[in-house]
């Protein structure tokens, strides 16, 4: 009979425990025919346990029924596993429920199959058998009795003394925070001249070699380069966002006026403003004084209203009365017959044209216009020569 593919070489032994004699015999026949098993049948679970107690190492597979009157199948499974821990048991039941399946597996069974067994189940039954355990059992049987204890001890000692036969174990170094701190300290000291050999000397750690330091140094530099690129990308992105928020016109205006936005002293603008205001006020005061002098017939002293201390103090404008020099008289007769006489006398120098120009300016500033039904102002320039007598 051809050997079943997947089964170990040699004939395996099996036990079938079932109180149903017909089903036990049919199962035994199919195991022998399909899988080439050497099968032993028991209709009493207690007798089967007595057999296992003396021949447990020679049994490779056990098929036991769950529902038996003499002894429950779960109790049989528990005792069988205690007698031989490596024995493989497959339970059979007419009710393959989830509860029954979980309980069988929990007690150490390989699988739960539906009863009665058919040819298809028997053909696939070997898939639930741990063939590795079966092979190890066969190897132990073959090695048993070969050589004495002294021979085995000598071979073991020779293997231990020869280091070439031992496989060298590889281990990985974990960079703890303490090692990382020493590594960064060494980099800070060495700077650009950092090499794995110099780093190892400064770190002073025995259980580390230059190759591991070189690998960690390369990773450290790659990490720094990556962080630098990420930081530059973040900065560029923030600048683009700020420019998009400001707008092209506003950003151009900000760039153009960035150099001019500098703090300046407030002293010079304040002084300039005060000076302009004082000059305007003084200018208004001069013309206001001239208008009052013409209105009330008093003497207008220009030196009192002059802002230049080095000005000519001899020039005066005299309003009213008879004075020497050039005189201008204005006579106005209104409808009521009242007479108004205004005379402006300018001394030093005595110039008729200059006097006429001054009078014209004063009349224009007062807004005097000849209108119908109102007072008409008439100005006449009188030139008195020195030869004429009063």
From Swiss-Prot:
Disulfide bonds: none annotated. Residues 257-271 have a biased composition (Polar residues). Residues 13-130 form the Response regulatory domain. Disruption phenotype: Dwarf, narrow leaf, lesion mimic, low tillering and late heading phenotypes. One of its GO terms (cellular component) is nucleus. InterPro entries: ARR-like, CheY-like_superfamily, Homeodomain-like_sf, Myb_dom_plants, Sig_transdc_resp-reg_receiver. Two-component system major event consists of a His-to-Asp phosphorelay between a sensor histidine kinase (HK) and a response regulator (RR). In plants, the His-to-Asp phosphorelay involves an additional intermediate named Histidine-containing phosphotransfer protein (HPt). This multistep phosphorelay consists of a His-Asp-His-Asp sequential transfer of a phosphate group between first a His and an Asp of the HK protein, followed by the transfer to a conserved His of the HPt protein and finally the transfer to an Asp in the receiver domain of the RR protein. Transcriptional activator that binds specific DNA sequence. Functions as a response regulator involved in His-to-Asp phosphorelay signal transduction system. Phosphorylation of the Asp residue in the receiver domain activates the ability of the protein to promote the transcription of target genes. May directly activate some type-A response regulators in response to cytokinins. Functions as a response regulator in response to cytokinins. This is Two-component response regulator ORR29.
């Amino acid at each position: 009979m051809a050997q079943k593919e997947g089964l170990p070489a040699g004939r395996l032994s099996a036990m079938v425990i079932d109180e149903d004699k017909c089903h036990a015999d049919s199962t035994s026949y199919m195991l022998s025919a399909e899988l080439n098993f050497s099968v032993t049948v028991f209709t009493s679970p207690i007798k089967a346990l007595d057999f296992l107690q003396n021949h447990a190492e020679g049994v490779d597979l056990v098929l036991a029924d769950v529902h038996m009157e003499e002894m429950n199948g779960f109790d049989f499974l528990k005792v069988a596993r205690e007698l031989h821990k490596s024995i493989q048991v497959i339970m059979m039941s007419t009710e393959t429920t989830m509860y029954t399946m979980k309980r069988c597996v929990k007690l150490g069974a390989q699988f739960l199959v539906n009863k009665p067994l058919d040819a298809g189940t028997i053909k696939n039954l070997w898939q639930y058998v741990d063939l590795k355990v079966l092979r190890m059992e066969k190897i132990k049987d073959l090695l048993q009795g070969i050589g004495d204890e002294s021979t085995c001890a000598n071979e073991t000692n020779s293997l231990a003394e020869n280091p070439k036969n031992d496989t060298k174990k590889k281990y990985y170094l974990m960079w703890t925070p303490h090692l990382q701190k020493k590594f960064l300290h060494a980099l800070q000291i060495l700077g650009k001249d950092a090499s794995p050999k110099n780093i190892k000397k400064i770190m002073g750690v025995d259980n580390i070699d230059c190759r591991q330091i070189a690998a960690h140094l390369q990773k450290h530099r790659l990490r720094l380069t990556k962080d630098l690129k990420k930081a530059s990308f973040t900065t560029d992105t923030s600048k683009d966002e700020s420019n998009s928020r400001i707008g092209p016109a506003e950003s151009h205006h900000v760039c153009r006026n960035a150099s001019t936005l500098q703090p300046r002293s407030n002293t010079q603008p304040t002084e300039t403003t005060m000076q302009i205001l004082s000059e305007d006020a003084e200018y208004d005061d001069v013309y206001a004084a001239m208008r009052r002098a013409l209105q009330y017939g008093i003497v207008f002293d220009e030196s009192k209203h002059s802002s230049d201390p080095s000005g000519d103090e001899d020039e005066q404008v005299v309003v009213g009365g008879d004075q020497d020099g050039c005189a201008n008289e204005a006579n106005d007769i209104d409808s009521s017959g009242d007479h108004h006489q205004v005379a402006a006398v300018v001394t030093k120098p005595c110039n008729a044209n200059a006097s006429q120009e001054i009078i014209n300016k004063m009349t224009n500033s007062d807004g005097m216009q000849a209108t119908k039904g109102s007072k008409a102002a008439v100005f006449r320039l009188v030139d008195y020569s020195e030869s004429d007598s009063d």
